[in-house]
Amino acid sequence: MRWTLAAAASIVLGLGCGPADLGTAALRAFGNEPFWNVTVSDTAGIVYQRLGGEEVIFPYQAPRRSADDGTTLLFGPLRTGSGEHEIEMRVSEKGCQDTMADAVHPMRAVVILDGEELMGCARRLDDDPGAELP
């Protein structure tokens, strides 16, 4: 993943969604090397999955806004029902370029699963999956 000025500009031009819209929206965060994704839904919970791995399901908890900038949504820390896994996630309204998919996404995400930090992109599930790069 690489963050770019072009991706950030797409936010300013209105291609992204504002953080005010994210509190109730389903969203997906994802990254490469290792390939992983987190899907957030108030009905299905917060579901983490690594490519080829099993889903790890956390209870849904509405995000809160960071005190420092107000544009970053914070999820967690949350634990699975068994207490075996813990997740935290920060989603910010900063452009993100997925170089493997050659796509620009409106948000970036940092996920911490059981102490391992994963960085990637994010988008609302009802948004365009990403604008093509020129």
Regions found by a protein language model. Give the residues of each.
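C-terminal motif of bacterial Sec signal peptides marking the signal peptidase cleavage site
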Residues: 14-16
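Bacterial N-terminal signal peptides that target proteins for export
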Residues: 1-7
